Structures are given as structure tokens and as C-alpha cells.
Amino acid sequence: MTKEKELHCSFCGKEQKEVDKLIAGTSGYICNECIELCHDMLANADDIEEIDEEFQEEEPKLPTPHEIRAHLDDYVIGQDYAKKVLAVAVYNHYKRLRSEKNTSEVELGKSNILLIGPTGSGKTLLAQTLARMLNVPFAMADATTLTEAGYVGEDVENVLQKLLQNCDYDIEKAQQGIIYIDEIDKITRKSENPSITRDVSGEGVQQALLKLVEGTVASIPPQGGRKHPQQEMLRVDTSKILFICGGAFAGLDKIIEKRTNTSGKGIGFGADVRIDEEKVSLTELFKQVEPDDLMKFGLIPEFIGRLPVIAPLSELDEEALVKILTEPKNALTKQYQVLFSLENIELEFTQEALIAMAKKALARKTGARGLRSIVETLLLDTMYDLPSIENLQKVIVEEETVTENKVPVLKFNS
């Protein structure tokens, strides 16, 4: 047998006589048929990559301001002006992110948002609803727990850590996210004049937040670890993250009144003031807020400059609280009705009971936030006994249940 007859393709095993060509390599042979097959496979792979790239380029349609506002209406009662401001700001923010993929000589700046409104007016809910609608990661932090790096308390960069955790440490997703910082009015500096002493929980936190809010590349330890020199860090670009800050800003109304020479009666949110001989709500007054007013309140100028969009929220009245109990898609009464239906029991709230609950929340000055506590207290004993009561068909919460702590009316199957 000659050496030529022993030669064969190292891939398909065919002998030299069975193929047109056999090409020698350093440690084997490949036939023309295997070369053609490999060429076809690589060509198909290129086609698949092109299809993948085209598919990735097709982003979901960005909802318009009208669509954003309509979605907020499904979950948040009232606050029409704030919804409009938020809808436009959020639309422009994500439009800016998409425009960065296209070459443009004009660089679009980021517009973070400041929500001003009393406790329980819906600031947090608005931010959460926006993130859920846009399907982007969301993280929330309480400004009062934050301190400068190196001091006892929560480092401001921990906020980014929360955002990363909420998207399984996908940096690209995190950089499209929304961060809500509550109680921002509680980190004001103690006086208008700079102090020689270090204010690590007031002005110091504002300074620490400044870089994150305006945009920086932050180094975050992976999977919630602590920073150390040898560790490989995750780098997050915060210039693409939308920051929404919220606070009650109690007393800001007086600063605006003083500047505008306004005289009014009543104090706090919801009071009426007189401007140009006309009575308007404090919400209208807060629409006139200027950077100087916020500086006098205690925010530093640099921080104010990073929150150019201001959305005032009004205090919720009795009618709004009743609507909050019943109208949103995830209204409180609907949630408890679902809980009771899991036991095959119907739950009903009379209109008088709803009004009484709204009045109780107003008296507590807790806004919508206090409604869950009220409903939970009213139904505690009933929910405790529920699984043990036989033949129960319906539970009715009446006005007396709220005002006189009476047990809800129970109706049984006959």
C-alpha cells in the first residue's frame, strides 16, 4: 500500500481518492468538501449576527407624555400638575439617552426632578409607578440615613448598590434606572452661612450626592461587598440614571411668601394664601419657587442646580382620599377584597365608611400613607377569626366600624 493511499481528511475521514483536493497542515489534512462546509457555516453565523444586531437595534417604543400621564392616572389620584411635569421630564430624559446613540454636535443635559409635597401626597408612588411602566430598575433611599463616606451611617454610593441588586448586577440596565431619594429636605445645612465645623449629615450629604446626581463613573464593589484596594470594582455611569428627590419642605411656603410680599392666613400645606388679591392654593405658590428660596431653606446652590425640574404636589383632601381607597387599579379596598376572596368571602365597604376613613387619615395628617394602617386596624380581628368561621359569606365595613370601633357586619350562608 503506498503512502498516498493512506492520506485522509482529519475531519471527515475520507481518503484522498474520494475527494477533489486534500490540503496538508502542520499536523493533519482537510479536504475541499470540509472547507466548503466550514465556509457555509461561517457565512450563516455572520447572517445570524446581523439579524441579532438588527433585532437589538429595535428598541421598544418610548411612551409619549400623554401615555405616561394616562398610566399615572391609573395608579395615582390627583396631582395633575405634578403628573404633567413628570411625564415631560421622564420622556425627555429617555429620549436623551436614545439620542446619545446617534452622533450629534449638541450634547443634551440631564434634568433630574425635585418633588415638593406633604407626607402621603404620592411622591414615592409616582416614582415607583414611572419605573414600573418603563420597565427600568428602581431603587429608593432615605436621605436621613445617608452620611459622607468614612462616617458612621449609609454611604451615598450604597444607593447605587441597591439599584444594581434590583437588576441582578446588570450594569447596562442599572444605568437606565431611576433612583428616588426621599426626605431630601432633612439634609439641609443648618444655616445659610458656611460653617467651619463638618456637617456630615446635612450639607456634607448634599456634597456627596452632588457627583452622583450630576453624573460620574462610580466604583461599586460587586455583590454588596466592602471596598478594598485589590478588589475589582463595577463601574457605573450615573449620568444616564434619572434621580428624583422628594421632600415635604415644611416652612418653604413662608420663604416664598416673604419674597413675593404675600400675606396669607393659615399655615402648612393646603392653607389658602392671597396673591394679587386672589386666593390660591399652596400648590400654586410652590409653582413660583426659585433657587434662592431653596437656598434659604438650606439646600446648597450646586445641588439645586442639578435638580432643574420642580414638581409641587398638593395636600390630599377628603374627596381625593376616598378616591384613593377605591379607584386606582391597586386600590387599598380592592387589595383587601382579593385577600378575603381567597377565603371565598365577599368584603364590602359602605360609602359612609370610606368617608369616615378619609376623615380619620386627615385628622392624623398622614395623607394616603395612613390609610393602610386604618384599614388594617379595622379588619384585624375579623382577619384573625376568618379561617375559623364557618359558612361566612360576606363582611360589611360600616361607618360605625370606623368611628366607634364596632365589629364589621357578618353575613352567613343560609
UniProtKB/Swiss-Prot annotation:
Zn(2+) binds at C9, C12, C31, C34. ATP binds at P118, T119, G120, S121, G122, K123, T124, L125. One of its GO terms (biological process) is cell division. InterPro entries: AAA+_ATPase, ATP-dep_Clp_protease_ClpX, ATPase_AAA_core, Clp_ATPase_C, Clp_protease_ATP-bd_su_ClpX, ClpX_bact, P-loop_NTPase, Znf_CppX_C4. Residues 1-50 form the ClpX-type ZB domain. SUPFAM superfamilies: Glucocorticoid receptor-like (DNA-binding domain), P-loop containing nucleoside triphosphate hydrolases. It comes from the Bacteria. GO terms for cellular component: HslUV protease complex. Pfam families: AAA_2, ClpB_D2-small, zf-C4_ClpX. GO terms for molecular function: ATP binding; ATP hydrolysis activity; ATP-dependent protein folding chaperone; protein dimerization activity; unfolded protein binding; zinc ion binding. NCBIfam families: clpX (TIGR00382), PRK05342.1 (NF003745). Belongs to the ClpX chaperone family. ATP-dependent specificity component of the Clp protease. It directs the protease to specific substrates. Can perform chaperone functions in the absence of ClpP. Component of the ClpX-ClpP complex. Forms a hexameric ring that, in the presence of ATP, binds to fourteen ClpP subunits assembled into a disk-like structure with a central cavity, resembling the structure of eukaryotic proteasomes. This is ATP-dependent Clp protease ATP-binding subunit ClpX. It comes from Histophilus somni (strain 2336) (Haemophilus somnus). The gene is clpX.
